[in-house]
Amino acid sequence: MSDVGPDLYAGLERAAKVATLLVASDLDGALAEFTLDPRDTTPAPGGMEALRRLAALPATHVVVVSGRDVRTLRQLTGVGSADPILLIGSHGGESSDPTVTVGAPLDRGQKALLDELSEQVAELVEHHPGARLERKHAAVTVHTRGLSEDSAAATLAEAELLGSDRAEVRVISGKSVVELSVSSADKGTALAALARHVDADATFYCGDDVTDEDAFRALDPLTGDVTVKVGSGPTAAAHRVGSVSDVVAALEQLLALREAAVRAS
């Protein structure tokens, strides 16, 4: 038994024994604590190490799934092109491995729309000191972490309005963030496609925000999948942990169980 709790431990124990296992996690809020500046994000000690060791085991596939673009994910996680860990960026719109297709590339119209949205968001941020803009592969994001509650609410409401009347723009509201995406890709579709690609018998996934709910709904605990919500709030996940350090503990426990299963096989 471990400190992850008996129900989650039982799920990890079952998943560790399957023939082919897919291990996936969000970055921000799951593998890494939030920072005022999203460029300063650093994975918590132990998490990436556990993922690398899992990826080195037979029939064990590891992926980080994030709203960040793949280029930024490489910088923040330290995962290189020769690394066995796959990176899925832009909520499922990008893959670090060209042989793994999880989303369609942006067309000319989508790229032009993204440029237009970026200009509009840049103007918005100028009028709200402390708000930050992040340009991604298929989206532009407004971050308000660190702002007063009233200032953050006003900024995010204005950001939502920029895309609310445009059918081709997906407005994603999360924790201290609003993202305007020109892609319909989501983490659930990407994770399901990846599970089929590797022929996974079970998938582990943990995440903390609204976009992770797509992944939770795409997986099925009744067939052996393990879904873990980080933090409070309503969720479709079967399990819940309270913090990033709890995610690291769960990954380390899964690693120990998977290593034991490999030795016993």
What are these regions (language model features)?
Residues 1-6, 18, 183, 188-265:
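Mg2+-dependent phosphoryl-transfer enzymes with acidic/Ser/Thr/Gly-rich catalytic loops
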Residues 3-19, 73-79:
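Short amphipathic alpha-helices and their capping/turn segments at secondary-structure boundaries
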Residues 16-39, 64, 191:
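Asp-based phosphoryl-transfer active-site loop
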Residues 42-135:
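Active-site phosphate-binding/coordination module
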Residues 90, 96-112, 172-200:
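Substrate-recognition "cap/lid" segment bordering the active-site pocket of phosphatases
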Residues 117-121, 154-163:
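Short amphipathic alpha-helices in soluble, non-transmembrane regions
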Residues 130-147, 170-181:
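Charged, glycine-interspersed solvent-exposed loop segments at helix/strand-loop junctions
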